[in-house]
Amino acid sequence: MATVLSGTSGALYYSPAGTTATFGESAVDVANDEIDIATYLNLKVSDPVKFSVVNTETGAAGTGTLPAGITAGTTYYVIGYTASTGVLQVSATLGGSTITITDDGTAVSPNAFQVEYAAPAAVGSVRDWSFEITRSEIDVTTIGQALGQYAPFRSYITGFADGSGSATVYTTDDDTNLSNRMVEDVLQRQQVGATMKLYIDRVVSGGSVDDTLSRSITVPVILTSASLNVNPDDGQSVAINFRPSEAPTFDLTKS
């Protein structure tokens, strides 16, 4: 007999807004071991990032060679990013020195290099989350129908899908909590990279989440509001509202 899950089986993971960008060969500064990516992003020191080659027309994996000194799939850590210029420096270790770049790589259009937040990370002290998806319909009922005994039904075609979500997170004295980042991200103009991973049933094995046994919904989002609640009768909390920016990906089977 199936067992009903409790809310404590769930969890909320998040990739911050403004942490994804594409760049070309000319953006790689070999002399200074820097990369000139987009300006006014939201990359912070110690953010874990990964590099890849993507096809900018399809969004899928592209063809090309990353700059020498950077390995696809390897986690690097931001040691410097200047929003006004877009200059990025990364290290192979947390708090380490900048990597050495010896060649600017190869990426011919429509291919480009991409840097993105390594993976959604756990948001601590989450009270709850909710996510609703809807589908609209367009009324295409026509006149001139033959009338019979029963009232005729309307006819519809598929419209657009949409959704909305929210999460309530308790405020703690830990400045590194991603919930603080989420509040700031609401006002981030470029929210590319913001992603919620909504676990319905999170299974941990060996100290790490086992996604093959867990069930989750991954959805790129736009954060629309943050409402802070401070009063003497309750734990301090912040309510974050969001909407999908792309279609969600459902992983609702344990396999």
Say what each PLM segment does.
Residues 26-40, 58-71, 101-107, 120-124, ...:
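Surface-exposed ligand/attachment interfaces on beta-rich extracellular proteins
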Residues 53, 80, 92, 221, ...:
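Residues on the solvent-exposed faces and adjacent turns
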Residues 4-7, 14-89, 94-97:
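Autoprocessing Asn-cyclization modules and mimics
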Residues 92-120:
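Intrinsically disordered, low-complexity, charged/polar segments
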